[in-house]
């Protein structure tokens, strides 16, 4: 503060943006810490850090080929929890609850490899910007070559094919076909 009062910044940042940036770095730190310790047959699917009500939840989603059991999540929690306590400096601004679980039926597809493995599956794709006035596509993933997703989706009553550039994709997850 100078003698004329507080300095007002010309560009304001929304608190949601600050929280998102902080959560991203927490997710990156946790991912780098736990990835080397989650060994076959397990696969780290995703790390999420969110506020639910007044609580913060650190969710570590893990899977294996024949599915995760309650015993698996207990064993993994016993491996992961002490690892998180060793991170220095502590990246968590608040107390949090650790949740180790299966990604479920609508698991996120975060990597090119997971997308390649999902060819033939029914998926949900959210885009950064709309293609033909559509920002979310849900349909069968026909192909993925590392650069383009090809999806067969239903537009009202007609099947259509769309090619989506991989860099245009904000989120992809498995979807349940009803």
Swiss-Prot record:
Domain of life the protein comes from: Bacteria
GO cellular component: cytosol
Gene3D superfamilies found in the cross-reference section: Ribosome maturation factor RimP, C-terminal domain, RimP-like superfamily, N-terminal
Example GO biological process: translation
Disulfide bonds: none
Localization per Swiss-Prot or TrEMBL: Cytoplasm
Pfam families: DUF150_C, RimP_N
Keywords, ordered alphabetically: Cytoplasm, Ribosome biogenesis
Function noted in UniProt: Required for maturation of 30S ribosomal subunits.
Family to which the UniProt record says this protein belongs: Belongs to the RimP family.
Protein name: Ribosome maturation factor RimP
Record organism: Streptococcus pyogenes serotype M3 (strain ATCC BAA-595 / MGAS315)
Phylogenetic classification of the source organism: Bacteria, Bacillati, Bacillota, Bacilli, Lactobacillales
Gene: rimP
């Amino acid at each position: 503060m100078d003698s004329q009062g507080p300095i007002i910044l010309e560009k304001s940042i929304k608190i949601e943006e600050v929280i998102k940036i902080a959560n991203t770095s927490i997710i990156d730190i946790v991912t780098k810490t736990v990835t080397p310790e989650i060994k076959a047959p397990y696969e780290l699917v995703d790390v999420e850090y969110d506020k639910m009500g007044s609580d913060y939840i650190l969710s570590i989603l893990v899977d294996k080929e024949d599915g995760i059991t309650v015993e698996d999540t207990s064993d993994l929690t016993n491996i992961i929890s002490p690892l998180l306590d060793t991170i220095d400096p502590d990246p968590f601004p608040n107390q949090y609850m650790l949740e180790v679980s299966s990604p479920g039926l609508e698991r996120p597809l975060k990597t090119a490899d997971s997308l390649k493995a999902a060819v033939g599956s029914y998926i949900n794709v959210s885009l950064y910007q709309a293609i033909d006035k559509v920002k979310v596509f849900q349909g069968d993933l026909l192909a993925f070559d590392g650069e383009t997703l090809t999806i067969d989706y239903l537009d009202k009553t007609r099947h259509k094919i769309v090619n989506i550039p991989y860099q245009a994709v904000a989120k992809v997850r498995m979807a349940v076909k009803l």
